[in-house]
From Swiss-Prot:
GO molecular function terms attached to this record: glutaryl-7-aminocephalosporanic-acid acylase activity; glutathione hydrolase activity; leukotriene C4 gamma-glutamyl transferase activity
Superkingdom of origin organism: Bacteria
Family assignment from sequence similarity: Belongs to the gamma-glutamyltransferase family.
Subunit and partners: Dimer of two non-identical chains processed from the same precursor.
The protein's name: Acylase ACY 1 proenzyme
EC number: 3.5.1.93, 2.3.2.2, 3.4.19.13
PANTHER family, sorted: GLUTATHIONE HYDROLASE (PTHR43199), GLUTATHIONE HYDROLASE PROENZYME (PTHR43199:SF1)
Role description: Besides the cephalosporin acylase I activity which converts GL-7ACA into 7-ACA; this enzyme displays some gamma glutamyltranspeptidase activity.
InterPro entries: GGT_bact, GGT_CS, GGT_lsub_C, GGT_peptidase, GGT_ssub, Ntn_hydrolases_N
Organism: Pseudomonas sp. (strain SE83)
Annotated Pfam families: G_glu_transpept (PF01019)
Keywords: Acyltransferase, Antibiotic resistance, Hydrolase, Transferase, Zymogen
Amino acid sequence: MNAPVPVPRVADFTCEKKPASGSRGMVVTNHPLASAAGAQILLAGGNAIDAAVASLFALTVAEPMMVGILGGGLSHIRLADGRHVVIDNLSTAPGKATAEMYECLSDEIGKQRDTRDRQNVVGAKAVAVPGALKGWCEALARFGTLPLAEVLQPAIGLAERGFVVTPYLSNCITDNAGDLARDPGLAAMLLPGGKPLQPGMRLVQSDYAASLKLIAAEGPDALYGGKLGRALTDYMAANGGLIDQADLANYRIELREPIRGSYRGYEIIGPPPPSSSGVHITQMLNILEGYDIGSLGFGSTDAVHLLAEALKIAFADRAVATADPAFVKVPVARLIDKAYADERRALIEMEQAKSWTAGLSGGESADTTHVTVADAMGNVVSATQTINGLFGACVQIPGTGMIANNYMYNFDPHPGRALSIAPGKRVFTSMAPMMALKEGRIAFALGLPGALRIFPSALQAIVNLIDHRMSLQEAVEAPRVWTEGGVLELEEAIPEAVAQALIARGHKVVRSPRVAGGMNAIAFNPDGTLTGAACWRADGTPVAISGGLARAGARFTI
């Protein structure tokens, strides 16, 4: 990207972290040890795909509350030849799942997924068929260069040696201590003596290290047809879960073509349904393109108002039109059409917040992780993966160290809707592993955790970079806003005068200490260097690679 040009700002802020700069590779993840794992693989001769997979496995150790091999997600890959592919390894509903399997408690905005006894949140009945391990191994087999056993070594070592607990991890354990205490394995691992692990304590995961070694020897078959899979299905059968051996054997990843849109001279590329990000980020950018956003000033009343209205429009359409395309006909062409954006934009009122309904016919948890990796050959990976809620279903499969997802929470527990449960149906997601091109060359790649707040936050980072001319570090750390049609959340750095002006326009404003999770990103500069950035909302750390080998023919003499 070109150097940022200063533009007016109403909401001012100071970045808490510093970017990294490199020329031969960049790894940015939400934990420094995972970034180091990816960098280690790049230095060993691996490419960006090898490094991304190594980082993801390391994150299953260092961020056990966020991601695991029993989870799912999306990996957006740009290959050195310019091809883009999205690997969909999202979890699926078990074959025994039904649309009526949970007792619903509410249909209010924000409470639609509430069920009796939180059965779609904690426990065996909340677990969907995992896709993470198969997806990561498939990415490595198709596009990587190193064997799985080598790529797994950093994670195995991390699990065996242990690592120092960060305040962020300790806080996550504390926040979920009640649910964790109900599972013997997680209680022993995370609540020694009945108390949460504290910052500075060491977390060792011996059982999980053994599971990773088994995967290194047997590949994904260790889970989808072997010992680890039997441990999972035995636990499910004994505890009211639905996953069986047939579910594991029948699970398939999907290779998908990304959604492509345009915004002020950039090509914006993101994942297609069942992710909502590619479609609805494109839709919202099409709406915003009709305004001179940059001249309004970052964080101004008008700029925030337009973001809020665009978000409400997208969420209204998303609720009725976007789901697993194998089960629901998704009107992608209509949603990303600039003419449709013109129709929706014409209904926006600058001085009045509106309630929006869908313009056509037709819930997730915030606890996810993201990696962004680039190598010297031109391969780029933007991958978002999760076990869904904090520590997933708060279930550890005995003897394996594996933490199960609670992906069933992402379905609408009410029957007869686009997002209702059906056997084999892929979960719906807001994951937004995004990339942008300028004149055919990659300009930036980014992503973050945060559930329903993911794609709105990714949208804001794109607007920050293109309209507000922010640096990459500023774009990922800038204060965010969010709404799906109810309250309008404003992070604390948005000025109170702006909040009051938005209230006067009819917005239901609430303050939030944090909207979504820790974004990480890579910018590709005209001089061939890479800039990596991670934000204050997580333990994110960029690790850059520069330098290189000695000049050809160089000798050491004395």
